[in-house]
């Protein structure tokens, strides 16, 4: 016996299907050429006027900082209405804002349900102040000294979500319009959650937007991208972004770096150094920054300091020495201050600038290693971290000369 089902018949009591609404594209994440294309493809602006309109809209978003198309007074009302129907320029939700006694500011930003990242503004770093931004939600690197870096990768951030971190900071710092002479935000460091070179396409677009002179206008020489050493992507990073390069080094030999930075097993030190030496634009005016966390009895001996000098010989560089901030369950301790100073003295004698940076924002849990343990007690669903280097003050006082 066969049975035939008539699937065309639906009960009159059945609820109608809910249409799936496609999220609006956030124009804040589009470079100017991408913005031109989006305006034409959407039919909001005719081709002949698209370039002019794109520049107007771009300036309103990134120079004036508006969050509503209705505020774009030199754009026709009809065009503004069509823009609002097709796109958005809204900011993400700020879940939490904290300000440290030392002026450090931290924002917990919800990009989407379950997608939260932290950004930190550190005053007095670089020319005026630096913002540490994230490029991914979660991380795949599993660096053994990093409490927060062991969290699983959720997804890459979009260019709009990266740029939004800058916009949120500028909102809070009252930094609009972007050409204010007394701006407090002068530098951007990609040292938050994630490995930027595993999301280079979106990172590169964000850098183009942030550095565009019609908008936020932060020079590419004041934008630093930190990597644990994704060697095949170094050349592309330099050629497409012209950003300053920072390397999370932390060891001078492969056996130790394999433990501290497991990515080293894939791209060992010799390969990493070759990639750094070939980095586009590397010069005394565009030095690479080596980040080196000071771990007691692990990588802090005078022999290690001399090995570091030998390793980077001939590379225009500076070394940021970062005191380790212990976290519960960690196998590591911070080097004694005298040990750190002795390490720095060896580097300085060899001609390398080697500032020692102490953590900033400890009272708002913005110091290295505090973010995962303390934040998860409050909000277990949030997957976020800020890099060790940024919290220790990635840029030294002499960076103003390099990034002017």
UniProtKB/Swiss-Prot annotation:
- Upper taxonomic lineage: Bacteria, Pseudomonadati, Pseudomonadota, Alphaproteobacteria, Caulobacterales
The identity of this protein, by name, is Dual-specificity RNA methyltransferase RlmN
This entry carries the following GO cellular component terms, namely: cytoplasm
Its source organism is Caulobacter vibrioides (strain NA1000 / CB15N)
Q: Which UniProt keywords apply?
A: 4Fe-4S, Cytoplasm, Disulfide bond, Iron, Iron-sulfur, Metal-binding, Methyltransferase, rRNA processing, S-adenosyl-L-methionine, Transferase, tRNA processing
- In which residues is [4Fe-4S] cluster bound? 139, 143, 146
Name the family.
Answer: Belongs to the radical SAM superfamily. RlmN family.
Cystine residue pairs: 132-368
Active site per the UniProt annotation: 118, 368
Among PROSITE patterns, the record links this protein to:
RADICAL_SAM
What PANTHER family does this protein map onto? Answer: 23S RRNA METHYLTRANSFERASE, RADICAL SAM CORE DOMAIN-CONTAINING PROTEIN
Pfam families (UniProt xref): Radical_SAM (PF04055), RlmN_N (PF21016)
State the remark under miscellaneous. Answer: Reaction proceeds by a ping-pong mechanism involving intermediate methylation of a conserved cysteine residue.
The EC number(s) given in the record are: 2.1.1.192
Q: What does this protein do?
A: Specifically methylates position 2 of adenine 2503 in 23S rRNA and position 2 of adenine 37 in tRNAs. m2A2503 modification seems to play a crucial role in the proofreading step occurring at the peptidyl transferase center and thus would serve to optimize ribosomal fidelity.
Encoding gene (name): rlmN
């Amino acid at each position: 016996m066969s049975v035939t089902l008539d699937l065309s018949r639906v009960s009159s009591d059945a609820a109608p299907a809910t249409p799936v609404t496609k999220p609006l594209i956030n124009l804040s994440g589009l470079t100017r050429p991408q913005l031109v294309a989006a305006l034409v493809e959407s039919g909001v602006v005719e081709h002949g006027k698209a370039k002019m309109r794109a520049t107007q809209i771009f300036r309103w978003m990134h120079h004036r900082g508006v969050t509503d198309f209705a505020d774009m007074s030199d754009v026709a009302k009809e065009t503004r209405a069509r823009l609002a129907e097709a796109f958005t320029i809204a900011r993400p939700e700020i879940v939490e804002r904290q300000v440290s006694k030392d002026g450090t500011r931290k924002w917990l930003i919800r990009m989407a349900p379950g997608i939260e990242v932290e950004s930190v503004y550190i005053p007095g770093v670089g020319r005026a102040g630096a913002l540490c931004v994230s490029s991914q939600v979660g991380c795949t690197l599993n660096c053994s000294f990093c409490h927060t870096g062991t969290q699983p990768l959720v997804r890459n951030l979009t260019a709009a979500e990266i740029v939004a971190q800058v916009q949120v900071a500028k909102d809070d710092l009252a930094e609009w319009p972007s050409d204010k002479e007394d701006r407090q935000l002068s530098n951007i460091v990609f040292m938050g959650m994630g490995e930027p070179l595993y999301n280079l396409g979106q990172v590169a677009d964000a850098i183009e937007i942030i550095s565009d002179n019609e908008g936020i206008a932060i020079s590419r020489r004041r934008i630093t991208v930190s990597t644990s050493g994704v060697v095949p992507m170094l050349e592309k990073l330099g050629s497409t972004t012209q950003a300053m390069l920072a390397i999370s080094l932390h060891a001078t030999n492969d056996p130790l770096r394999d433990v501290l930075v497991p990515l080293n097993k894939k791209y060992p030190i010799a390969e990493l150094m070759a990639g750094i030496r070939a980095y586009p634009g590397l010069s005394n005016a565009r030095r690479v920054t080596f980040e080196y966390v000071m771990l007691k009895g692990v990588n802090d001996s005078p022999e290690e300091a001399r090995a570091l000098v030998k390793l980077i010989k001939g590379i225009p560089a500076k070394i940021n020495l970062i005191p380790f901030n212990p976290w519960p369950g960690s196998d590591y301790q911070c080097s004694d201050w005298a040990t750190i100073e002795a390490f720095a003295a060896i580097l300085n004698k060899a001609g390398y600038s080697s500032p020692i940076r102490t953590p900033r924002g400890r009272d708002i849990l913005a110091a290295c290693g505090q973010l995962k343990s303390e934040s998860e007690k409050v909000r277990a669903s949030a997957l976020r971290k800020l890099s060790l280097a940024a919290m220790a003050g990635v840029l030294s006082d002499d960076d103003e000369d390099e990034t002017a």
